[in-house]
């Protein structure tokens, strides 16, 4: 879908660039596939802030998305493409031959009226889901499981995809968007194609209020705070912090490695940081 730019009739309109959603469904979602969603304001059950920068935002309904695609060998027709406020990608309402309705992540080049199917092995066509072991090398794939039956976890946001680059001892080698290459079990499911709405990254919200509509609060820089509030705080006049970037709790940030999982280290063939090393 194309991008829309607006005439500068106000400061908020100047520079505003949004994705054109005219081809999406304009009605309400399927009631049986939605549920209410309560705002947390970034607080836990004790009322303590556990995730900063969250507050307000437009009221949303949660859409149940089928990330597992375990209804095998039953063709489904794409009824419509819809907007989903809970994610950057668009979603597709599909109707199976037995009458069941479901929402799936809409891949690029999926249109209303198309027929899709999930199974152990299917045609390599956008929207079809199958086991990674059955996909030809070079296939573009999204919504990839990391454990069989758990549901897709990799490449789910707008415009993302991974690529099958090889096979080895019952495992499939997949290159992720970050540049990482890793083994994934061949029984894990994946969906052919790249996720819809690739122009999401080229949007410009135009004004701070649009971010507030999304439920995002302003972020205060550490160097603008007092020493009691942040390790970068204080100092006479404007200072640059004087130390490597850290979180308010003193942990290194901005590029510091945080991954600690020895049990799955053996599944990573090439780290996403490999290209950065000199």
UniProtKB/Swiss-Prot annotation:
Entry keyword set: Ribonucleoprotein, Ribosomal protein, RNA-binding, rRNA-binding
Keyword Transport: no
Molecular function terms, GO-annotated: rRNA binding; structural constituent of ribosome; transferase activity
Subunit structure: Part of the 50S ribosomal subunit. Forms a bridge to the 30S subunit in the 70S ribosome.
UniProt similarity note: Belongs to the universal ribosomal protein uL2 family.
Function of the molecule: One of the primary rRNA binding proteins. Required for association of the 30S and 50S subunits to form the 70S ribosome, for tRNA binding and peptide bond formation. It has been suggested to have peptidyltransferase activity; this is somewhat controversial. Makes several contacts with the 16S rRNA in the 70S ribosome.
Record-linked HAMAP family: Ribosomal_uL2_B
Protein name (record): Large ribosomal subunit protein uL2
Organism of derivation: Sphingopyxis alaskensis (strain DSM 13593 / LMG 18877 / RB2256)
């Amino acid at each position: 879908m194309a991008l829309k730019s607006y005439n500068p009739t106000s400061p908020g309109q100047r520079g505003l660039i949004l994705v054109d959603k005219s081809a999406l469904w304009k009605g309400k979602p399927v009631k049986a596939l939605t549920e209410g969603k309560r705002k947390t304001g970034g607080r836990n059950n004790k009322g303590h802030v556990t995730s900063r920068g969250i507050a307000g935002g437009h009221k949303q309904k949660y859409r149940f998305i089928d990330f597992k695609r375990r209804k095998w060998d039953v063709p489904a027709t794409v009824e419509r493409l819809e907007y989903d406020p809970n994610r950057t990608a668009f979603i597709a309402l599909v109707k199976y031959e037995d009458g069941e309705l479901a929402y799936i992540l809409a891949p690029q080049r999926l249109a209303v009226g198309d027929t899709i199917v999930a199974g152990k092995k299917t045609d390599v066509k956008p929207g079809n889901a199958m086991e990674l072991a059955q996909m030809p090398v070079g296939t573009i794939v999204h919504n990839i499981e990391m454990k069989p039956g758990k549901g897709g976890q990799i490449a789910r946001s707008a415009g993302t995809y991974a690529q099958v680059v090889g096979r080895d001892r019952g495992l499939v080698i997949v290159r992720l968007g970050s540049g990482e290459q890793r083994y994934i079990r061949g029984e894990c499911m994946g969906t052919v194609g790249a996720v819809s709405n690739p122009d999401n990254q080229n949007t410009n919200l135009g004004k701070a209020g649009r971010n507030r509509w999304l439920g995002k609060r302003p972020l205060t820089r550490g160097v603008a705070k007092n020493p009691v509030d942040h390790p970068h705080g204080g100092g006479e006049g404007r200072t640059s912090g004087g130390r490597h970037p850290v979180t308010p709790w003193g942990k290194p940030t901005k590029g510091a490695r945080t991954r600690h999982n020895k049990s799955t280290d053996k599944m990573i063939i090439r780290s996403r940081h490999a290209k950065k090393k000199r």
